[in-house]
Amino acid sequence: MSLSVFWFLPTHGDGQYLGTNEGARPVDHAYLQQIAQAADRLGFGGVLIPTGRSCEDAWLVAASLIPVTQRLRFLVALRPGVISPTQAARQAATLDRLSNGRALFNLVTGGDAEELAGDGVFLDHRERYAESAEFTRVWRRVLEGETVDYEGKHVHVRGARLLFKPVQQPRPPLWFGGSSEVAQDLAAEQVDVYLTWGEPPAQVKEKIERVQAKAAAQGRKVRFGIRLHVIVRETNEEAWQAADRLISHLDDETIAKAQEALARTDSVGQQRMAALHGGKRDRLEISPNLWAGVGLVRGGAGTALVGDGPTVAARMQEYADLGIETFILSGYPHLEEAYRVGELLFPHLDLVVPEIPRPAAILAQGEHIAHQFVPQKVSQS
């Protein structure tokens, strides 16, 4: 099976090591542009742009990089409870039009109650997913060209519609990751691509089978992707040395502080990530060539595939055999590691390289009348 491989834009910081400012580098627009253009040229299918208060705004970053890339797609976050579904639909359509169909959207419910409260969201885990389901129902229908009346517990709109259609039809794809039962129910009902963090293959297999069964019960099919870090070198020995070097500045106090902060989340996925290593340095290779060292101090995706090109490709194929079609990878620092992946890993993959999209036909229609109607040709009397 051909695989699509995405890269990652480190809008929350980057450097040579984890958990220290030693070897850190400034992440300004010029640096993000370097990474995006490298990914564009190397054949990555797109880039994931993270979201949250520790990151630059994903939508603005994506918009700023459209003119300097040709084929790269941008996976940006939708935040139910933080923005209305109709406004999000308008923004999504605009980003898709400006990028000539290169926009993808990632539904993010959040898991940190403290951060969510700062954004004005005070719902518990189950209610956040209920709100996300309502949000997504409206968002999808509006983008697909419907005029929507909807009254739910959390979302209420009347006459919601879109005047400027997206390039991708019927709408840009919706991605989503979540490990709880309610998250998987949402995925089965609403999303196009279900994402998992890089757990061992047996655990990923269980997730895929559950989501597939839930989707089939609703007459739907869902595609699957996985989010992993990667440390690829010319030899396996060099790759493991690089993994050790990445956490060589970490002390036990920093690890404990990070694990304490991550433990307050109600994210089931984050809890599963933490359980893989237990905050201990001595149990980091949790599956062949799957290393949990990143998760000692990083929230979210916390595991990396480690090895030479053929070894990492073989481990990726194990996930592909389970149904994974898209791999979202990253490595520290992100510019250099993008080139290493392109040079050492890509030759061993059956890689899907996106084509440069042809310009979409945007029809001339004049200014909308009273902000409501597309003007029509006036008949001659």
Curated annotation (Swiss-Prot):
Entry protein name: Alkanesulfonate monooxygenase
A GO molecular-function annotation: alkanesulfonate monooxygenase activity
Reaction(s) catalysed by this chain's protein: an alkanesulfonate + FMNH2 + O2 = an aldehyde + FMN + sulfite + H2O + 2 H(+)
Function noted in UniProt: Catalyzes the desulfonation of aliphatic sulfonates.
Enzyme class: oxidoreductase
Domain of life: Bacteria
Subunit composition and interactions: Homotetramer.
Any one GO BP annotation for this protein: alkanesulfonate catabolic process
Misc note: FMNH(2) which is absolutely required for this enzymatic reaction, is provided by SsuE.
Enzyme nomenclature, EC number: 1.14.14.5
Similarity comment: family membership: Belongs to the SsuD family.
